């Protein structure tokens, strides 16, 4: 049952991160907000570990958990939030986010030995095409089309997506066993190792403590860091990483719907058409594929 509903819940929880980021940017600096979020998330997961008497991993696995957290959370969200705060348009950032499943699919055969079949490759390409259609109006908007002033933030945004792709594959290869609660706790320690020095070096640690800022922080900790990330780790462990990553394609259309409800942003025809293409791509990528007997023998030998 959980295997069926987990992707749906994950898409909803993960997509709210974009709305939360919009609220949080008004009330806090990016690294400061993320550092507080990671610290509270680590404490929340630690409390669950103690309450449930979870078995902690050995030193080698603990190090791998901390290391993976540096990429899954620290470099990824730190780079993404900083890039958006420093001039990368949301539409372009959406395209970059949509690149993650393609990066994952290309790297998975090399790093974790997964093989994608033709239909799954088609699904990944359709997902990217759907995202491009959905946000095409923003690409041709003069207010968002000029990226000459945002070369460095754009590069940081690209590096952030490569970071979460690497972190996802590393998680799949090296953290397939053990209790997920201690692993998640240690991953947020890894995120703090990245974020705290950035906060101390580049920010004044501004957080205004308003009701909106606190609400965004609470949701970031319990809805995103615990709910969304917990489900992501579960999906990575239960299925192929490229299939789990393909769910990222559903984020921009879902965020657009949430932005329409929360901020009154219009739902355009390209967005609706793009969403249809995206959903088709995700379906093809996640559809079970029958492996021919000859291919199955080759996989067993590998």
Regions found by a protein language model. Name each.
Residues 1-35, 43, 144-173, 193, ...:
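Glycine-/small-residue-enriched transmembrane alpha-helix faces in small-molecule transporters
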Residues 1-3, 27-31, 35, 57-63, ...:
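Juxtamembrane helix-entry segments on the extracytoplasmic side of multipass membrane proteins
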Residues 7, 60-69, 116-129, 178-187:
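Cytoplasmic-side transmembrane-helix entry/capping segments in multi-pass membrane proteins
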Residues 13, 17-18, 46-97, 133, ...:
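Specific transmembrane alpha-helical segments of multi-pass solute transporters/efflux pumps
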Residues 26-75, 101-107, 162-167, 184-203, ...:
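Transmembrane alpha-helices of multi-pass small-molecule transport proteins
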Residues 34-36, 77, 92-99, 169-192, ...:
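Helix-helix packing/entry segments at the starts of transmembrane helices
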Residues 45, 119-139, 195, 249-250, ...:
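Hydrophobic transmembrane alpha-helices of multi-pass small-molecule transport proteins
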Residues 47-56, 100-125, 253-273:
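C-terminal transmembrane-helix exit sites in multi-pass transporters
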